[in-house]
Every structure is written in structure tokens, then in C-alpha cells.
Amino acid sequence: LTKAGIEKFLINTHYLHEQVESYIEQSKFACMVDLVYEEELLLTGGTVIANKDFISDEPFMLVHADNLSICDYKDFISAHKNRPANTEITMMTFTTDDPKSCGVVKIDNSGIIQEFHEKVQNPPSTTANGAVYIVEASVISYMERLNKVKVDFSVDVLPYYMGRIFTYYNGLYHRDIGNIRSYELAQIETDSLYRETS
């Protein structure tokens, strides 16, 4: 992300927060990171609202930490800057090998999302939501109007912006690492990927 020109980060912590904070504080990137402990999780949108002063009025990248994404982030940012008119969010997508386990999308010829299906029995596609977004600051105003402390970005925000969400396809590597099996698999896959590209 730093190679793409991103210079400041905010990370919310909760589970095993002391270990996470200790790791980050010893990192060479520590001076670029603001750590925010949430005793009770505010959900993705709630965290954004609570830290809107950190974001100011600029577009920001919103990343779910239980994913491992390897891609050209400069290209991702460029795609957002050059997105179609009237779109306010750019969602990273990827091809999933298990579409029943995640949110899948249907997009039009312009790359704009027309349908979103969250963990359905008969998913209509294998193009999945990578839970990595570039978001215009105007979206924060909408989230604030919900008058909720806890705002789920996938449930409370994405449906409202249907037809106004552009997509960026990550064809290099993306995996949900929210459980031990997928985390171990990601280590094997990325090790192999780095060997192939080095």
C-alpha cells in the first residue's frame, strides 16, 4: 500500500488487541499507523463514522482485515479515479472457488454492480466481493444519516449504492483468511506465487 502512495493508516483492534498493537508498534510502519481499540466492535461503517476526522474529505480505502489481497494497488486507485460518472465506491472483486461462502456480484458491461447476493444456495456468478473498497467521503454523510452507532457496510451501505458501485477485478491473488484452513492455504499459495514471480 505504501508503494501505491498511501501514507497513513488507521487500524481498529478488538480480539487479541494487545498482540496486534505490539506487533504494529514494533513495525517499521508504526509512525504511519493510528491504532484505535474498540471494546465493542462498531462494525465496518461504524468504525468509519467514529474516525471520520482521520479521513477528512478525501476518498479512502476500506479493507477488511480477514482477507489477503495481492494486486497492483496503484492500478486499483487509478481505476477509482477514472470510474464511471455517478459511482461513489469502487469494490475489489475476485473469482471465488466457493461462491456459496461469500457475497457474489453481477456486473454490467461498464463494470458497475447490478446485483449483490450474500451467501446464497444457488449463486449466479463466481465473481465475489473482495471486501476491499475505495470510498468517496460523501458516503460517510449517508452513513451518519442512518443514526446508528453500529453500521454494517455490506448490509447498511452497499444495497443503498447499488448501481453506483464500480468494480476492479483482482486477477493476481485474493483469499478470505477468516479461518485456520484458509489462512494455511493462503500461506502455501502466496509462497508459491512469490517463487513464480521472483
Regions found by a protein language model. Give the residues of each.
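Conserved N-terminal catalytic core of the sugar/cofactor nucleotidyltransferase
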Residues: 1-64, 68, 75, 142, ...
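Short, well-ordered beta-strand micro-motif
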Residues: 8, 93, 106, 134-136, ...
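Rossmann-fold dehydrogenase core element
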Residues: 32-33, 85-86, 112-116
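Conserved beta-strand scaffold positions in the cores of enzyme catalytic domains, especially
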Residues: 35, 89, 165-167
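Catalytic-core segments of class I nucleotidyltransferases/pyrophosphorylases
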Residues: 61, 68, 74-81, 97, ...
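A short, conserved acidic/glycine-rich loop-to-beta-strand motif
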Residues: 84-95
